[in-house]
């Protein structure tokens, strides 16, 4: 019998896909990848999969790995897709594929199935990651298969299939949008959010924090310490990557930090609207930036900043396991070596303001930077500097005089 691993959530879609795969003659191994998504009873989901005919089911907790090995390297790049999206969903997908393929190798499965649609980005991220890790894996994306779409044109048919197969599904009140959550962020899209005249921030019931208007009237300070670009301490206490993100989610969330509403360019060609909240990661991006301002060489920082949009694109599109990304990650690891220090931020009604920053590797020299008289900067040196810098402009001006 053919064997398949299924990225399984226990929801309606993957419950139906589990049954459908068995109808197609597959032995199915269900994998629930714990990224920090909300779930009432993970044990019940695993039992449900086995009850519904799965050969095996397992939960794999990768929350720490997601923060440490995926989100934090992207943070070091200050990578934001189209300038504002912190890639909370995008960066989780290659990890899901990695976990599912590890299980496939263990159980001898030759196929990998997921429930992503044929119109979104996730299908790209799942498949590009999986085929990079195992070029021989058979990808099964039911929503890209016409016979599956014909059988299940809507939610009603999905529920009817579950009734016939005696697959237990919990009835839920349909919200006017869909959401996807992990420890890094929550994304909201589709439904009423596809109407651009709808105020997304007012429509969405945010799950990670309060609105800026409802945040406390007094600023809250938070101090974050970095070692070579990696967040290590929070308010003076050493924490692991997961603890850092979870605790900052609470702190930043209660101060209304980290909400965005954007229209983005999907990899598959269309524009789509997304509303996102990433309170903890938003604070980390700003905190790291302030330590970098002290410690990174100017030209190195500017080079990183020019390359960061390309890194964001690669993550967003799904090109995580590539030689190019490997090289880029080696670069950023070297670039971040001096980025050690501590920064104190004030969080106030959605805003992030720096209070202080310090670093043993600081390149800031008050004696050089002072605008007062004296200091160690000799202003006479600027004369020769500007004569050399201005030479091309003077020559060009003689050859092609500008009208003014």
Curated annotation (Swiss-Prot):
CDD domains (alphabetical): ASS
Known partners and oligomeric status: Homotetramer.
Gene Ontology molecular function: argininosuccinate synthase activity; ATP binding
Enzyme class at the top of the EC tree: ligase
Binding positions for L-aspartate per the UniProt entry: 117, 121-122
Natural source organism: Rhodopirellula baltica (strain DSM 10527 / NCIMB 13988 / SH1)
Name of the protein described by the UniProt record: Argininosuccinate synthase
Keywords in alphabetical order: Amino-acid biosynthesis, Arginine biosynthesis, ATP-binding, Cytoplasm, Ligase, Nucleotide-binding
Residues noted as binding L-citrulline in the record, renumbered to the chain: 85, 90, 121, 125, 178, 187, 264, 276
Reactions listed under catalytic activity: L-citrulline + L-aspartate + ATP = 2-(N(omega)-L-arginino)succinate + AMP + diphosphate + H(+)
């Amino acid at each position: 019998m053919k064997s398949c691993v299924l990225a399984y959530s226990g929801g309606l879609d993957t419950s139906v896909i589990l049954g459908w795969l068995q109808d197609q003659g597959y032995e199915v191994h269900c994998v629930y990848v714990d990224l920090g998504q909300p779930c009432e009873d993970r044990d019940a989901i695993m039992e449900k999969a086995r009850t519904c005919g799965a050969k095996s089911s397992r939960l794999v907790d990768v929350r720490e790995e997601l923060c440490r090995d995926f989100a934090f390297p992207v943070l070091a790049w200050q990578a934001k897709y189209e300038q504002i999206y912190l890639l909370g969903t995008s960066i989780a997908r290659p990890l899901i594929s990695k976990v599912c393929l590890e299980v496939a190798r263990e159980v001898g499965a030759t196929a990998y199935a997921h429930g992503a649609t044929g119109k979104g980005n996730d299908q790209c991220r799942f498949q590009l990651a999986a085929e990079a890790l195992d070029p021989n894996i058979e990808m099964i994306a039911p929503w890209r298969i016409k016979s599956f779409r014909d059988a299940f044109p809507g939610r009603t048919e999905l529920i009817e299939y579950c009734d016939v197969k005696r697959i237990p599904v919990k009835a839920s009140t349909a919200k006017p949008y869909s959401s996807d959550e992990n420890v890094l962020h929550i994304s909201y899209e589709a439904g009423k959010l596809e109407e651009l005249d709808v105020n997304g921030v007012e429509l969405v019931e945010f799950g990670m924090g309060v609105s800026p208007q409802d945040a406390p009237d007094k600023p809250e300070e938070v101090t974050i310490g970095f070692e070579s670009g990696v967040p290590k301490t929070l308010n003076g206490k050493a924490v692991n990557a997961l603890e850092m993100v979870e605790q900052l989610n609470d702190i930043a969330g209660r101060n209304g930090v980290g909400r965005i509403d954007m229209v983005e360019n999907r990899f598959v060609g269309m524009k789509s609207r997304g509303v996102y909240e990433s309170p903890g990661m938003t604070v980390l991006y700003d905190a790291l930036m302030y330590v970098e301002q002290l410690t990174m060489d100017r030209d190195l920082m500017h080079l990183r900043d020019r390359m960061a949009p390309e890194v964001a694109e690669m993550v967003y599109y799904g090109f995580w396991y590539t030689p190019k990304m490997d090289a880029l990650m080696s670069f950023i690891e070297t670039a971040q070596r001096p980025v050690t220090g501590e920064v104190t931020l004030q969080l106030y009604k959605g805003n992030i303001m720096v209070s202080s920053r310090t670093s043993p590797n600081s390149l800031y020299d008050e004696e050089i930077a002072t605008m007062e008289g004296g200091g160690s900067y000799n202003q006479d040196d600027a004369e020769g500097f500007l004569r050399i810098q201005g030479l091309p402009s003077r020559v060009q001006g003689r050859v092609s005089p500008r009208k003014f």
